[in-house]
């Protein structure tokens, strides 16, 4: 079956709001002086939420940090666009999940985000998939239950720090769905 084609857009607060929040330095966020005046602390740039009490499992949950060392999935060529096919989406039904890129320059295209809303049956609505390109200074927090592609990095190996809650029950922590009709995402390469 032929892949549906979509174009990735720049990651912005407004465009991503239905799926979560963008984690980045913002002028409209309250800032206070910290560390004896040697730092600026930007308050509440993103929330970590867990709803494991809605799970049928009685397992204890805990917040965990993980590192993802990802090999590039998108290899920009010398042309204007690069492409990547998405055939798998995952969600964390009871927790937000935050990714923060490390060791990428702030204005370089660092990774691709693909998200889909829930269909009426609770599975991903593949036809409504949207894609975003995040820069090196942008993290992202997926809301609990948001279908998203596994991490797709652009151009070079990238380390990402990730935070979410887990209770050790596979179906509670991560649900995965695949499709035989992949989504082909085109990414405009910035030079």
From Swiss-Prot:
It catalyses: (S)-ureidoglycolate = urea + glyoxylate. Homodimer. Belongs to the ureidoglycolate lyase family. Keywords: Lyase, Purine metabolism. Pfam families: Ureidogly_lyase. Its EC number is 4.3.2.3. Catalyzes the catabolism of the allantoin degradation intermediate (S)-ureidoglycolate, generating urea and glyoxylate. Involved in the utilization of allantoin as secondary nitrogen source when primary sources are limiting. Pathway: Nitrogen metabolism; (S)-allantoin degradation. This is Ureidoglycolate lyase. GO terms for molecular function: ureidoglycolate hydrolase activity; ureidoglycolate lyase activity. GO terms for cellular component: cytosol; nucleus. It comes from Schizosaccharomyces pombe (strain 972 / ATCC 24843) (Fission yeast). The keyword Lyase applies. The keyword RNA-binding does not apply. It comes from the Eukaryota. SUPFAM superfamilies: RmlC-like cupins. GO terms for biological process: allantoin catabolic process; purine nucleobase catabolic process.
